[in-house]
Amino acid sequence: MARFKRILLKLSGESLMGEKQYGIDEKRLGEYAQQIKEIHDLGVQIGIVIGGGNIFRGLSGASKGFDRVKGDQMGMLATVINSLGLSSALGAAGVKARVLTAIRMEPIGEFYNKWKAIEAMENGEVVIMSAGTGNPFFTTDTGSSLRGIEIEADVMLKGTRVDGIYTADPEKDPTATKFDDITYDEVLKRGLKVMDLTATCMCKENNLPIIVFDMDTVGNLKKVMTGENIGTLVHN
C-alpha cells in the first residue's frame, strides 16, 4: 500500500550521467524507469520533473560568457532531451508516459496545462513535465515546486545522490549528521541547501512536504512510497 496517492518526483539531470562525464547513462536511465514502474504498479499517480545539468546548466553558461536568458533556454531544452529519454525508457518498461513542455514544441511534447497533466495521471499515465517553468532565471527545483503545487501532489520526492539532508555536506565534512525530519523554518534558519530559496519558500507557503532521498540506490523509491524510514522529510 502506497503512503501517497499523487507525487511529484524531482530527478537530477546530473544523476542521469551515471558513471559517464556527460549525457545520459542508459543503465541509470533504465534503473530509474524500473523504480518508477514499481510505484506505478502500486497505483500511484506520478508527475516527474527532470533537471538538465548532465547536458547544460544555464547558470554555469552565464559564468562562461553566455547571455543568461539564452543559457537558461538551452538548459530548458536539456530538460526536454532528458524527459524524452525517460519517456522512452518507461515505454520500454511497459509504462505509458506523456511528455508535457512549458514551451510550445509540438510534436516533441504537448503544451503543458494543469488539467491535462491531472487527467493523464488519473488515467494511469506517468506525466513528465519539461522545460522548467518556460521562463529564464528559474531553476528546475523551482519548476518542480510549481508543478507539484499545481498538480496538487501530496508530496515532492527529491531524488538525489545523497540519502537525505545533513548539517553540512557529507561528501566534504565527515562529522555531518543526517536529519530524519526537519521543518522548513529550520532549513531556512540554518541556510541548508535543500533547494534554492524560491523553491523552498514556495513549498513552505503552499504546505507541500518534501522527502529528500537517494534515488541512485535501486529500490529506494518504492521504500519511500511504502513507508520505510529513509531520506529526510521536510515539512511545516
Swiss-Prot record:
GO terms for molecular function: ATP binding; UMP kinase activity. ATP binds at residues 10-13, 53, 57, 160, 166, 169. Its EC number is 2.7.4.22. It catalyses: UMP + ATP = UDP + ADP. CDD domains: AAK_UMPK-PyrH-Ec. The keyword ATP-binding applies. It is an enzyme of class 2 (transferase). Pathway: Pyrimidine metabolism; CTP biosynthesis via de novo pathway; UDP from UMP (UMPK route): step 1/1. UMP binds at residues 52, 72, 133-140. It comes from the Bacteria. Catalyzes the reversible phosphorylation of UMP to UDP. Belongs to the UMP kinase family. HAMAP family: PyrH_B. This is Uridylate kinase.
